[in-house]
């Protein structure tokens, strides 16, 4: 793979929950002269999924998207790249086409808002004359070279983190976790996703609409759980499909594990095969997956997100607290690169 070139990237503080992203008219007027004909790339969204957070999720994933499109239009951009998720297909299993979905139901409110956002952005960009490319990553993991977590606590790392948090209890009892051992989960290294995004960005002839940023193959849940058990020292954990949580038969630790890992049911219980019409073929072997599990467990046990010198909590204007890390010696104006949940990228 060729190295990504990020020369000329400038970070501008903004807030997707505010009109015009909180940017001043003066700034937009100035930038319009430089940005005309450019491409607007929208990463930011909320990964919250619980019903109790519906207002916050909608504010970020729906209203925030409206505000972003308004700014892209005001800047006279030609194209809009929207980073969505491969799981807008909801409870559907099997083949997943690169098209807009209207599933019968969703696994959680996060999936529902991201699906609604894809339909919304399609209409908005069409009305404003913006060429639209929707990028759908699957479960994003660390870079393929180092396999480090980068401080991420979501996706695969969230699942491992919850199991590690309960490790003291899980070591001494037999526990059955809800999941389909025969199902497959699609994991994709973050640098592969970035290369897909840049490929779509650099190709003016790319087809409008959804494009999957996914691996060519799935990882079997039974194999993934076995790797986690081996490297975490949890031989008594088993995975099987449970029709419902039985409060009388299931142990307290099983009920607790079910609650804390509820978000991951959509990837541990059903298999999705994502269509990928163009781009490189990304394949993850068992040895690759094991390296990721080893790094994730190591990060949990060492307490290191990614070995920052300093860690603080920042509360930006959008009210979503973020972990802020500093590493090395700051001898110039600092720069930060983050995704929608402030994970370093």
Predicted regions and their residues:
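Glycine-rich phosphate-binding loop and adjoining beta1-alpha1-beta2 segment
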Residues: 1-9
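Conserved C-terminal active-site "lid" loop/helix of NAD(P)H-dependent oxidoreductases
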Residues: 190, 222-223, 248-282
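NAD(P)H-binding glycine-rich loop region in Rossmannoid oxidoreductase-like domains
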Residues: 5, 13-63, 75
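A conserved pocket-lining segment of Rossmann-fold NAD(P)-dependent short-chain dehydrogenase/reductase
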Residues: 53, 146, 156-192, 196-200
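Glycine/proline-rich active-site loop of Rossmann-fold NAD(P)-dependent oxidoreductases
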Residues: 143-156, 200-211
